[in-house]
Amino acid sequence: LCNPSNRRTPRGSWVGWQARYGSLKVGKRRFLQVIEDRGLDVVTQVFFDMQDYTEKGLREKIRALPDGVYYGEEWFEDDGITATPFGVRLSLIVDGDEIIFDFTRSDPQANGPINAPYVVTMSASLNALLYMIGGDLPVNAGLNRTVRIVTKAGTIRCVRLPGSSVGGQTESSPSLMG
């Protein structure tokens, strides 16, 4: 499950893993009980209904925004290896009930660990959108039906292997959320 010997805080890591594992076991047991009580078809339909609800709610909120293209930039002074600044450039396109986060103008990926994989860029973009307009909506796959995230492989917002990406989660991702 977890090898605590290669951690800076082995005891805390091990206790954390045990707690997560225990909560997953409880969640699994309770989820299976809901399926037994209600039936798999009903539970599955509820999942799809919740996604439809989220999509509809987010489309309504996006429609309330003025259509247009909005620009933003965030700069990192360096990547920890070179003294070169790196820019994240966003074109946010609002069109009716859809929204596009376009990061294709961002700088090429860095040698240092400030890059982000696509999934981190997607997650940060969706989180920013939820913070701005959708805080009351359930978080599920319905969000992805109205939002597109566009990046270019090999940039600091879509790192290509063997590029480093730890700072993409801890530094550049929060910068997208303001």
Please annotate each region the language model reported.
Residues V42, T54, D78-A83, I99-I100, ...:
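Flexible loop/turn segments at secondary-structure boundaries
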Residues S13-G16, R105-A110:
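A generic structural motif
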Residues L1-L58:
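N-terminal leader/propeptide and maturation segments of large enzyme subunits in energy/redox metabolism
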Residues N3, P10, R20, G112-P113, ...:
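Hydrophobic core positions in small helical hairpin nucleic-acid-binding modules
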Residues G68-S91:
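Flexible, glycine/threonine-enriched loop-and-boundary segments that flank and lead into catalytic domains
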Residues F86-R105:
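Short beta-strand elements
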Residues I35-F48, L65-W75, G134-R148:
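Flexible, glycine/charged-enriched surface loops at secondary-structure junctions
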Residues Q51, E55, M122-L130:
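Short, hydrophobic/amphipathic alpha-helical packing segments
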